[in-house]
Every structure is written in structure tokens, then in C-alpha cells.
A protein has these predicted regions:
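N-terminal cationic and glycine-rich segments that engage phosphates or anionic surfaces
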Residues: 1-92
Length: 92
């Protein structure tokens, strides 16, 4: 199964389970994929989708570090949860 289908299935499952903490990063990934496809006028394969996810994880890690340094543990915890949710879709 392609990574895009896996993401869409995970979105459906999170919506059915009413799991907002898991749904938010999945929607974010799908939006970033669609944006890149529109901007570059291409259809992304699994490697392209993986690169989008890696970029988003890197952004979240940077935000996590900044929030920790600023003493905003509440926001840092949210970023950590998003990192965990995104890393579940990266290949091992």
C-alpha cells in the first residue's frame, strides 16, 4: 500500500476514533503533500511523501527545542506528540 493511502486510512481511523491529537498531524501532512503537488505540478511518490514528512518532523523538532528553551512545556509536549505521530509514517 502506498504511503499516501496509508495516511488517508490513518486519517479516517483517527476521525472515527475522535483522536484529535493524532488527526491534527495527519491532516498537516496531507495538506503539505497537496501543497507541494500543486506548487510543483507533480504527483509525489512514496519517496517524495517521505521527504515532506521528514521536513515536517525537522520543523517540529526545532519548535520543540525553542519551546523548551522558553519554558513553554505545554507547547513542547504538543510538539512532541506531533513528532511521535509523524514518525510513525517514516520508514524504519
Amino acid at each position: 500500500m502506498s504511503l499516501l493511502l496509508t495516511l488517508k486510512d490513518a486519517q479516517k481511523d483517527a476521525m472515527k476514533a475522535k483522536d484529535k491529537e493524532r488527526l491534527k498531524p495527519i491532516r498537516m501532512v496531507l495538506a503539505a503533500i497537496k501543497q507541494r503537488e500543486i506548487d510543483e505540478q507533480i504527483t509525489l511518490d512514496d519517496a517524495g511523501i517521505t521527504s515532506v514528512i521528514v521536513k515536517l518532523v525537522k520543523q517540529r523538532r526545532d519548535s520543540y527545542t525553542q519551546y523548551k528553551d522558553a519554558g513553554r512545556d505545554d507547547l513542547a509536549d504538543i510538539e512532541a506528540n506531533e513528532i511521535t505521530a509523524l514518525e510513525a509514517f517514516l520508514p524504519q
